[in-house]
Design a protein with these regions (language model features):
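Short, glycine/acidic-enriched capping/hinge loops at junctions between secondary-structure elements
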Residues: 1, 24, 137-139
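Active-site cofactor/substrate anionic-group-binding motifs, chiefly glycine-
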Residues: 1-20, 157
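N-terminal amphipathic alpha-helix/helix-capping segment at the start of soluble metabolic enzymes
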Residues: 5-6, 113-120, 144, 178-181, ...
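Conserved, mostly hydrophobic/aromatic
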Residues: 16, 39, 97, 115, ...
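Conserved anion-binding
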Residues: 19, 23-104, 108-113, 118-122, ...
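Glycine-rich phosphate-binding active-site loops on the catalytic face of alpha/beta enzymes
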Residues: 34-46, 131-132, 140-172
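C-terminal helical cap(s) of enzyme catalytic domains, especially alpha/beta-barrels
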Residues: 49-55, 150, 163-186
Length: 186
């Protein structure tokens, strides 16, 4: 990671940290020194989030709170003892992240519009589970198209399998870029 960051690459470390405060603080401090640009931390409680902020110190590392994984549906949340639907849980966790001093959150595009309205324009919304129009959702229960995510206010899109598992990855990526450019009016 140090080598890639040293070459000027922006590293998005999707570690999804969740542990006791001391461990999260120390891990975040080590990652901040590595030159990573982004780090994900589960936004389940304020103690964990505040520990990550302390660990970051004055580093340029952007902290992103993971609200609810995009593959989790109502049954999955209920299995964890969570009775609130994602549409209610995501804004609650995003608010915890913002209050703790995080730079943004990782959230489905289905909640992005409500988050943008609630948390403001400067708060980052990173949207995974992106599926181009007509693509299979795979294990993503709350997937959206690139266009829908952008129109809802997403700052960044995370696109994986629609490119990496495509017969023609370059062609798939180019189509997604076209869809993004169209949504941006470029």
């Amino acid at each position: 990671m140090d080598e890639l960051a040293g070459q000027g690459h922006k590293i998005f470390l999707d570690a999804k940290l969740l542990d006791i405060e001391t461990t999260v603080e120390r891990a975040t401090a080590a990652i901040a020194k590595s030159g990573a640009a982004f780090l994900t931390v589960h936004a389940t409680d304020s103690k964990t989030l505040e520990a990550a902020v302390r660990g970051r110190g004055n580093a340029a590392l952007k902290l992103l709170g993971v609200t609810v994984l995009t593959n989790l549906g109502p049954g999955d949340l209920k299995e964890q003892g969570i009775i609130e639907p994602a549409v209610a849980l995501v804004p609650q966790r995003a608010q915890l992240a913002q209050d703790a001093g995080f730079d943004g959150v990782v959230s489905s595009g289905k909640e992005a519009r409500a988050l943008r309205e609630r948390l403001g324009h400067d708060f980052l919304i990173v949207t995974p589970g992106i599926r181009p129009a007509g693509a299979e959702a795979n294990d993503q229960t709350r997937a959206v198209t690139p266009k829908a995510a952008i129109e809802a206010g997403a700052s960044y899109l995370v696109v994986g399998r629609p490119i990496t598992r495509a017969e023609d990855p370059r062609g798939a990526a180019e189509k997604i870029v076209e869809e993004i450019e169209s949504a941006l009016g470029a």
